[in-house]
Structure formats: C-alpha cells, structure tokens
Design a protein with these regions (language model features):
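Structured catalytic-domain cores with a bias toward divalent-metal coordination
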Residues: 1-134
C-alpha cells in the first residue's frame, strides 16, 4: 500500500518527485516523496514559507537529491518551496497575489485570498497527514 498526497503517489520503498496541484490556482508546489522500506512516522520538511528563505529552499532541494528510501523509515514529504507565488515574483516574505505573509495566516481560510487558501490547503491536506513537521 502506498502513500497519496493530492495528485502525487509513492509506493513503499520508492521515491517520487513532482508538482502538487493546488485546487485554487494554477500554481504547483515542487514536492519529493520518499517512502522508506520500513514503517515509521510521516515527516514533513519544507522550505520557503517565506519565499526569500533561500537557504531553507536549497537545503530541502539538496536533501531531496541525497536521501533514498533505504535511508529512512516511514514517509518523508519534502516541499521545496511553499510560497511559489512570492518566490516567482521575487517578493521577500509575502505572496505577490495579495501581499500577505503566509506564516501569519494559519490556519487559513478556504474562502479567503490566495495566501489564506494556501494556508488552509497546507493545514487540511498536508499537516493533517504528518506526525512531525520540520
């Protein structure tokens, strides 16, 4: 039995990379999923809640390249950049769409602005599936 995260799926003992579709926009989150050979916790590591946190983004990207299923137990979800909207627009810490700081709007609102919806999506579709968040 594998692990499903939105439109992405990974089998036990496998690694997959792709783009997680967001239901409220055409933006997609770059994600790497690794399902270890043994059962264990589900861990989320992300970069780019603030889109100019380049060290975190690079760290997640490097980790995603290096880690393999035999290196972990459980499931590792790596979101390389969460605030892709702000990253693409080169804003420092806010979404270009609405000027909001993603880190300040959790748990979000499914009927709110772009950033509110992104926070809501993270809460409902991702945070709800993890045991630990780094």
């Amino acid at each position: 039995m594998g692990f499903q995260l939105g439109n992405l799926y990974v089998e036990k003992g496998q690694k997959t990379c792709g783009f997680l579709k967001l239901p409220f926009t055409e933006d997609e989150l770059p994600v790497t999923l690794i399902y270890g050979r043994e059962e264990g916790p589900t861990v989320l590591v992300d970069g780019g809640i603030h889109n100019a946190e380049y060290v975190g983004i690079e760290c997640v990207t490097g980790l995603a390249k290096q880690l393999q299923p035999e290196d972990i137990e459980g499931i590792l979800i790596m979101i390389h950049i969460v605030n892709v909207n702000g990253f693409q627009a080169r804003t420092v810490s806010v979404s270009a769409e609405d000027g909001k700081n993603l880190n300040r709007v959790f748990p979000g609102n499914e009927n709110g602005t772009y950033t509110d919806k992104l926070a809501y999506f993270m809460e409902k579709e991702i945070f709800s599936k993890v045991d630990y968040y780094i």
